[in-house]
């Protein structure tokens, strides 16, 4: 063997070792570092990381009867798995105490996505899959009505957009590429193939999210955050941490002190704090009072009263009074149609010492939702229109929700026809049926001010017949589109308020119990 051959062999071995080392890093160490790391992300943050983390960790024990609640944000904003679990366990259904419901949902989960998740769902061996479906999940964006032609669905535009959809690139890139490789250009093909083969490339857009959150919680001040996760004031709190002008809160103390930070929007804001005694009455004097001359974040350190045993107290209850108030329009005019009234903003984990993990699928109750429920009909419609459809930067722009609303009107005057999303749903139904997997499809509650555009038309009636035609011993269908007639329980066309979701969760439980009872009798 000459020296040139030895060099070639050595090069091959080194290349193989480097390749194996990279594969070990990418396929073994990287997933451990990413998904075994504490997930401290809260509700509605980093949806793709949270879904992948949830997907990996859903497990049902042999003596459990699992329920997977699948769907898009329609499911996330209309179902509470814990409530459904509790209601089933306290029902009189056989083995009710063995049931446990979990989300298998992420934003924009379409029937196409459900089809690609079907093998993973079957591998988890749930007793039942509940698919919460709204017609908007069928990608109504691509409905079109051209002059002198019938209503149709633009499959080419859908496929073009699907090639760059997050879930198609992050969650099932290989499977999607295998089915649609003929529709990719050479550059698109290799870009998708790279995501299919290399996890570091696939997950790079959200790889830092859990680590950044961890650093913010453990080494910084928790000023920068999406949603509030701290102690809950008795009067409630807005999701982004803004308080009412007057609120009462029980705080976990640090060495007997209230040691936190607060944010004031403008100079001249006064914050007065009263501490409650052990008997539950506020002290006769103001424990803290200060007028802030500068806007921004400020430290808040307050000595508390010792209890009767003179021990260092662990908790204390305070009443905050803030004046003058702040309008939500001063902070961000895009959040609400009709301005809300704020007091101060709290740090993310205000008055709570524990940094919680595993809360990314636990919805947070905010005053954002409650304010809508107490509006007059006139104010609700005014807030709704401005919050959802008004674009001050470009009044002529047609946002997605407005486009879907217009397409619902088009469908309202159209005969029934199907497109690819229904075909993928049929494939999933057939696969579940072949594997004996029980499935419930729920046509989700819809805001009556939106459903009026198409629910009485031929297309919608044909759609309901399409879903109902698949009913069998292993598949149930429940039409709940009109089950919540109060428009003020809806944030938008199909997302429910916190309290509205409690009502729909109870309806979902009724549907589940009805289906399981019927299935049990047939067995």
Give each language-model segment a name.
Residues 2-19:
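N-terminal Sec-pathway targeting helices
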Residues 22, 27-96, 116-117, 231:
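Membrane/wall-proximal cationic-aromatic binding patches
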Residues 70, 74-165:
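Membrane-embedded segments
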Residues 147-244, 339-435:
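Secreted/periplasmic serine-hydrolase-like ester/acetyl group-modifying domain
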Residues 223-361:
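Basic, ligand-binding patches in group-transfer machinery
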Residues 403-409, 445-460:
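Active-site His/acidic residue clusters
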Residues 425-440, 469-476:
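A structural motif corresponding to the C-terminal end of an alpha-helix
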Residues 454-456, 460-521:
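C-terminal regions of proteins
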């Amino acid at each position: 063997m000459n020296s040139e051959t030895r060099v070639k062999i050595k090069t091959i071995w080194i290349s193989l070792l480097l390749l194996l080392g990279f594969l070990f890093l990418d396929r073994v160490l990287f997933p451990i570092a990413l998904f075994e790391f504490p997930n401290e992300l809260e509700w509605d943050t980093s949806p793709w990381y949270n879904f992948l983390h949830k997907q990996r960790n859903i497990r049902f024990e042999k003596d459990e009867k699992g329920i997977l609640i699948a769907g898009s944000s329609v499911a996330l904003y209309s179902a509470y798995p814990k409530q459904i679990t509790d209601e089933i366990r306290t029902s009189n259904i056989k083995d009710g105490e063995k049931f446990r419901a979990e989300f298998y949902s992420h934003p924009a989960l379409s029937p196409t996505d459900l089809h690609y998740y079907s093998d993973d769902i079957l591998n988890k061996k749930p007793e039942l899959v509940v698919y919460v479906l709204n017609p908007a999940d069928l990608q109504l964006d691509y409905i079109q009505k051209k002059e002198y032609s019938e209503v149709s669905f633009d499959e080419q535009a859908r496929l073009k957009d699907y090639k760059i959809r997050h879930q198609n690139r992050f969650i099932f890139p290989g499977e999607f590429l295998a089915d649609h490789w003929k529709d990719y250009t050479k550059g698109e093909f290799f870009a998708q193939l790279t995501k299919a083969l290399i996890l570091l490339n696939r997950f790079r857009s959200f790889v830092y999210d859990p680590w950044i959150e961890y650093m913010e919680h453990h080494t910084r001040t928790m000023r920068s955050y999406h949603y509030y996760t701290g102690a809950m004031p008795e009067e409630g709190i807005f999701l982004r941490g803004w308080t009412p002008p007057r609120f009462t809160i029980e705080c976990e103390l640090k060495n007997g002190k209230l040691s936190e930070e607060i944010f004031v929007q403008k100079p001249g804001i006064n914050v007065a704090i009263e501490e409650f005694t052990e008997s539950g009455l506020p002290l006769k004097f103001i424990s803290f009072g200060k007028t802030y001359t500068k806007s921004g974040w400020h430290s808040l350190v307050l000595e508390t009263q010792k209890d009767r045993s003179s021990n260092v107290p662990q908790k204390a209850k305070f009443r905050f009074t803030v004046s003058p108030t702040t309008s939500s329009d001063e902070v961000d005019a895009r959040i609400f149609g009709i301005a809300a009234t704020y007091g101060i903003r709290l740090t993310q984990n205000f008055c709570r010492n524990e940094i919680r993990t595993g809360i990314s699928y636990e919805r947070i109750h905010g005053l954002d939702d409650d304010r809508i429920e107490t509006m007059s009909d006139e104010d609700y419609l005014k807030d709704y229109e401005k919050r959802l459809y008004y674009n001050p930067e470009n009044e002529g722009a047609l946002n997605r929700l407005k486009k879907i609303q217009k397409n619902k009107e088009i469908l309202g005057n159209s005969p029934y026809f199907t497109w690819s999303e229904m075909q993928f749903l049929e494939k999933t139904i057939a696969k579940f049926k072949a594997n004996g997997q029980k499935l419930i499809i729920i046509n989700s509650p819809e805001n009556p001010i939106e459903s009026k555009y198409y629910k009485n038309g031929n297309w919608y009636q044909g759609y309901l017949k399409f879903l109902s035609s698949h009913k069998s011993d292993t598949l149930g269908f429940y039409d709940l589109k009109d089950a919540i007639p109060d428009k003020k329980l809806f944030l938008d066309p199909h997302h429910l308020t916190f309290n509205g979701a409690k009502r729909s969760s109870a309806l979902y439980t009724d549907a589940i119990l009805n289906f399981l009872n019927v299935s049990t009798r047939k067995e």
